[in-house]
UniProtKB/Swiss-Prot annotation:
ANK repeats lie at residues 439-468, 472-501, 505-534, 538-567, 571-601, 605-634, 638-667, 671-700, 704-734, 736-765. May be phosphorylated by MAP3K2 and MAP3K3. Proteolytically cleaved by during Fas-induced apoptosis. Cleavage at Asp-342 and Asp-380. SUPFAM superfamilies: Ankyrin repeat, Protein kinase-like (PK-like). Disruption phenotype: Conditional skin knockouts in embryos show significantly thicker skin and aberrant skin stratification with Krt14 expression extending into the suprabasal layers throughout the epidermis. Adults show a similarly thickened epidermis, with expansion of the spinous layer and basal cells independent of proliferation rate. 60% of adults develop spontaneous facial tumors when aged. May act as a tumor suppressor in the epidermis when exposed to dermal carcinogenic agents. Residues 22-286 form the Protein kinase domain. Expressed in the epidermis of the skin (at protein level). Ubiquitously expressed, with an abundant expression in the thymus, bone marrow, pro-B, pre-B and immature B cells and a weak expression in the spleen. The record marks D342, S343, D380, S381 as: Cleavage. This is Receptor-interacting serine/threonine-protein kinase 4.
């Protein structure tokens, strides 16, 4: 059977396969090219891909086309070309190596990619195309686009789909058909659209490569908003290229050079476009030095392309400042960068900032033994001996002990802290991704804490677990939200991240967003169904926290989500209590007007929002609460009214407000104190004056039958004593028979004693017992007696 197949197909070194050799058929892709199945070879014990013809019944012409594609791929055996093994006889299909990551098109649409990976993909694609063009005769791909650039498990490029590939100079009039062109038309050069009979040449692929660069830079599809193929063709012929949106921070400096290369590659004149041999030299430099000055690659071509540009760049999104920050001073669009390159404007670029903390902070133990794990150089070109040596060395060094060692751990930590994504891409191994550091944190925790967004992207691409916790119970999401790292938050939420995970204080990520007033992160979390009712160890929901920290924007966001503002926290505190306590007037107004909210709601100890505002002296909050019908005479469990609280804490303006709004000035606490007693006892002169002006009873007796004068004298508040003293009060005794003078002398308050003596306080036997002391009060008493 196999011999018959070989003769029939004339495959040369390729082999034929029977359907029985494969198991577990799973469709992984379909389109105009047919269907692609993931299969497992029964004997080889490995996964392969089979691209089957779109037709149910394959005729001789389709068989020949499939055979031709297989032969081209066989001829083009190379590191960045997808390996082909042969032909499956039934169903008829091309048997190839299975690429776990899938196509570049799929990857670009899935999540933001690290810049180092983007540069590497561009470079490896260029190296693969250079190999094809260096064949004799040159092999033209003619359908280079992200859908035909596959990526292995380590995100290395494998160029595929040689169905349209031809040798240099060949042409057929039927090559440009309208069937299946929608995904390809944007990658066709203008000369091919204008002249169907034009001979193919290498510059066709160079133009397509430019559009691939555009897609890698923007992670968008070219002309995505244009639904009419003819309109796209007309635009391209007229010199228009895909629109150039802003490239937001962070971005390496080499981005400008890559844009210049892209501009030359999509030039309207094919002769101006560089060859892939020239391109690979430039992309290799970009990969090696993405954050350093790179030679000017954007020299002015003979004729400028007509480009659609935008004059304004998007404002930079609020995000955590990265420790390694190589971006330009200002955000600018691709078109703005191009205009700067075209006009020859030199840009002064700041160097990357360095992270303040050093890798030594991680306290990694020294390694007694270890192995150097295998890695793949990201910049080795097809003809670079340096790249080959690097690869050879790392592979040989990979044999050794199993598992990551301390020295490998230190390399990973150093790469992440320094923001060296290129280094991280080379040394990170699958078994290292969820490595636990000495602080019980993962590499992902470290990257988030250091603000290294590019490293976070690479770790997530390698399936780092976003739900691991450190010693404090924090996940990377907790840390990212706490540090307001919006970009990192978006990356984490794009994964299967637990949005309601709690740290050691029972805080969720939404608690941190509420505390920081981070509306962007709050919205992102709510879109991922973050719970608004999770409570921390003090019973606070995110709404409580937002009110406590005065984050009105978060309060409004949560209210729009229907959050229950009547949900009680610890000790029955409502969000309104927290807002009143902290004096956040706009939030108090907002909450007090919500349906079902009572401005007289009491905490476990009986305090209302008005009590709390009075205690902290938040006059404007107290006024709005009173305007909203808060009871000025409501009592706490200790029978304190808001006036008692204001007097005790000395907030005179608030006390005046309460008095003018009907607060009872003679109300007694559970211990028998009036507002005047509390103001005098605590030495609040202005409040005492206010209460006296408001006709508060200075003769009123409190605990131990003491007047306000007794209380002020006992505490040594001489100025208050001066205000309260009168002939009727000065020698009054409490239930222990002590006058104000006795109490002042007992407390050794000499200035108060002097004040009372000055006003004629009587010295009796009870007072004389203090004369034996050495205090200044005793001295005053002795002098007065004599």
């Amino acid at each position: 059977m196999e011999g018959e197949g070989r003769g029939r197909w004339a495959l040369g070194l390729l082999r034929t396969f029977d359907a029985g050799e494969f198991a577990g058929w799973e469709k992984v892709g379909s389109g105009g090219f047919g269907q692609v199945y993931k299969v497992r070879h029964v004997h080889w014990k490995t996964w392969l891909a089979i691209k089957c013809s779109p037709s149910l019944h394959v005729d001789d012409r389709e068989r020949m086309e499939l055979l031709e594609e297989a032969k081209k791929m066989e001829m083009a055996k190379f590191r960045y070309i997808l390996p082909v093994y042969g032909i499956c006889q039934e169903p008829v299909g091309l048997v190839m190596e299975y690429m776990e990551t899938g196509s570049l098109e799929k990857l670009l649409a899935s999540e933001p990619l690290p810049w180092d990976l983007r540069f590497r993909i561009v470079h490896e694609t260029a190296v693969g195309m250079n190999f094809l063009h260096c064949m004799s005769p040159p092999l033209l791909h003619l359908d280079l686009k992200p859908a035909n650039i596959l990526l292995d498990a380590h995100y290395h490029v494998k160029i595929s789909d040689f169905g349209l590939a031809k040798c240099n100079g060949m042409s057929h009039s039927h090559d440009l058909s309208m069937d299946g062109l929608f995904g390809t038309i944007a990658y066709l050069p203008p000369e091919r659209i204008r002249e169907k009979s034009r001979l193919f040449d290498t510059k066709h692929d160079v133009y397509s490569f430019a559009i691939v660069i555009w897609g890698v830079l923007t992670q968008k599809k070219p002309f995505a908003d244009e639904k009419n193929i003819l309109h796209i063709m007309m635009k391209v012929v007229k010199g228009h290229r895909p629109e150039l949106p802003p490239i937001c921070r962070p971005r390496p400096r080499a981005c400008a050079s890559l844009i210049g290369l892209m501009q030359r590659c999509w030039h309207a004149d094919p002769q101006v476009r560089p060859t892939f041999q020239e391109i690979t030299s430039e992309t290799e430099d970009l990969c090696e030095k993405p954050d350093e000055e790179v030679k000017d690659l954007a020299h002015e071509p003979g004729e400028k392309s007509s480009l659609e540009s935008k004059s304004e760049a998007r404002p930079e999104s609020s995000r955590l400042k990265r420790a390694s920050a190589p971006p330009f001073d200002n955000d600018c669009s691709l078109s703005e960068l191009l205009s700067q390159l075209d006009s020859g404007i030199s840009q002064t670029l700041e160097g990357p900032e360095e992270l303040s903390r050093s890798s030594s902070e991680c306290k990694l133990p020294s390694s007694s033994s270890g192995k150097r794990l295998s890695g793949v150089s990201s910049v080795d070109s097809a003809f670079s001996s340096r790249g080959s040596l690097s690869l050879s060395f790392e592979r040989e060094a990979s044999t050794g002990d199993l598992g990551p060692t301390d020295i490998q751990k230190k390399k990973l930590v150093d790469a992440i802290i320094s923001g060296d994504t290129s280094r991280l891409m080379k040394i990170l191994q699958p078994q290292d991704v969820d490595l636990v550091l000495d602080s019980s944190a993962s590499l992902l925790h470290l990257a988030v804490e250091a603000g290294q967004e590019e490293c976070v992207k690479w770790l997530l691409l390698n399936n780092a677990n976003p739900n691991l916790t450190n010693r404090k119970g924090s996940t990377p999401l907790h840390m990212a939200v706490e540090r307001k790292g919006r970009g990192i938050v978006e990356l984490l939420l794009a994964r299967k991240t637990s949005v309601n995970a709690k740290d050691e204080d029972q805080w969720t990520a939404l608690h941190f967003a509420a505390q920081n007033g981070d509306e962007a992160s709050t919205r992102l979390l709510l879109e991922k169904n973050a719970s608004v009712n999770e409570v921390d160890f003090e019973g606070r929901t995110p709404m409580h926290v937002a009110c406590q920290h005065g984050q009105e924007n978060i309060v409004r966001t949560l209210l729009r989500r229907g959050v229950d503002v009547g949900l009680q926290g610890k000790d029955a505190w409502l969000p309104l209590h927290y807002a009143a306590w902290q004096g956040h007037l706009p939030i108090v107004k907002l909450l007090a007007k919500q349906p079902g909210v009572s401005v007289n709601a009491q905490t476990l100890d009986g305090r209302t929002p008005l009590h709390l505002a009075a205690q902290r002296g938040h006059y404007r909050v107290a006024r709005i609460l009173i305007d909203l019908c808060s009871d000025v005479n409501i009592c706490s469990l200790q029978a304190q009214t808001p006036l008692h609280v204001a007097a005790e804490t000395g907030h005179t303006s608030t006390a005046r407000l309460l008095l003018h709004r009907g607060a009872g000035k003679e109300a007694l606490t559970s211990e028998g104190y009036t507002a005047l007693h509390l103001a005098a006892q605590n030495g609040h002169l202005a409040t005492v004056k206010l209460l006296i002006e408001e006709k508060a009873d200075v003769m009123a007796r409190g605990p131990l039958n003491q007047t306000a004068l007794h209380l002020a004298a006992a505490r040594g508040h001489s100025e208050v004593v001066e205000e309260l003293v009168s002939a009727d009060l000065i020698d009054l005794s409490d239930e222990q028979g002590l006058s104000a003078l006795h109490l002042a002398a007992q407390g050794r308050h000499s200035q108060t004693v002097e004040t009372l003596l000055k006003h004629g306080a009587h010295i009796n036997l009870q007072s004389l017992k203090f004369q034996g002391g050495q205090s200044s009060a005793a001295t005053l008493l002795r002098r007065s007696k004599t």
